[in-house]
Amino acid sequence: MSATLPDVAVTEPSTLSAPLRWVGMQDIAIPVQLEAGGGQLAARASVQVDLPRAELKGIHMSRLYRLLDTQLQQPVSPAMLSGLLQALIESHADCASRAARLTLSGELMLRTPALRSEGLSGWRAYPVHIAAQCSAGRTTIQLQAEVLYASTCPCSAALSRQLLSDAFVQQHAGRDALALDEVAQWLQDHGSYATPHSQRSVAQVRVELPADAQRLAIRQLVGLCEQALATPVQAAVRRPDEQAFARLNGANLMYVEDAARRLRQQLAEHYAAFHVAVRHLESLHAHDAVAETDSDDAVLGPTTM
């Protein structure tokens, strides 16, 4: 029996000679350790290098996998990702590789407190996406996160208030004065005479980290988005929390345009390059309302929404 196993990727030339922009693997199941306190992702990874040597039959997939498996046992940081990309390129020096890219996708599990009930909290899952690329000696790292929130239509709210006002006037026509407790009781009985439509909504944001970034800070990105929107969906709730959520929605009426602009203003204070895509799953319509915006110098392209 021969002691040497054949390696046709090395010994047999390609019958079709052409360089390839990217070659590698995708949808690799792998656990990813985030920064201290950031938790762990049950992630799916994609990893590729370029293949400039047109005559070679293929790259060495196992080298990519082993590097990924070894390096991702340590917490992910910008420095770690930059080092991993360089190692991927160097592992294919015999292919003359000069570029590498890596994506990590998964759901970040965060425990979120209830709005009012002390000691009550629940889990939220946030889809996140980390993309790192090294090409021509330059490394870029992008983060993408998805946040769910509630949006209440400003127009529908105004129409509902008008109906409520008209009903109040009609039922109290001819009366010059009303006692405070009488008005309060009428509102208690008829305050839902008309209600504005609201819906679960989705925001996807992608940012490019500055070259000197020390941390990924995914939790910070999620927090910035939820702070800007003010109405993130909740996990565990009791009646006081549901009432507080209703108050937040009333204080933050939003068209899809408003949501996109809120996020743009918030992200512009922290990132030089970003892209925002929002989608309101309309309860009034059978279609969705969408909006996109980005930084003035963004070259990130659309999100994956």
Curated annotation (Swiss-Prot):
Protein name stated in the entry:
GTP cyclohydrolase FolE2
Which reaction does this chain catalyze? GTP + H2O = 7,8-dihydroneopterin 3'-triphosphate + formate + H(+)
In terms of Pfam families, this protein maps to: GCHY-1 (PF02649)
Pathway participation: Cofactor biosynthesis; 7,8-dihydroneopterin triphosphate biosynthesis; 7,8-dihydroneopterin triphosphate from GTP: step 1/1
- Which PANTHER family does this one have? GTP CYCLOHYDROLASE MPTA
Q: Which residues cross the membrane?
A: none
Q: Where is this site: May be catalytically important?
A: 153
